A protein has these predicted regions:
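All-alpha RGS (Regulator of G-protein Signaling) helical domain and cognate RGS-like helical scaffolds
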Residues: 1-69
Length: 69
């Protein structure tokens, strides 16, 4: 990593990975409450990704459901 943008890009990738991981496990929960917690955590990670994307001046995704796909 050579600059601030490199650090932000890494954080952005990690946040998207975390969101996708939380989304990916939702179907495996038999307990609805656990699924809800996972969905809330995913939403939180997406907010982090959004802030990092804004800091990097990246455009918003063209497709609506770009997470968990």
């Amino acid at each position: 990593m050579k600059n601030q943008a490199d650090v932000l890009r890494l954080a952005q990738r990690l946040e998207k990975g975390a969101a996708n991981a939380y989304i990916g496990v939702i179907p495996s929960f038999g307990d609805r409450a656990l699924a809800e917690v996972s969905a809330r955590l995913a939403a939180d990670e997406v907010m982090h990704w959004t802030v990092l994307s804004q800091a990097l001046k990246d455009p918003l995704p063209a497709k609506a459901l770009s997470f968990g796909a």
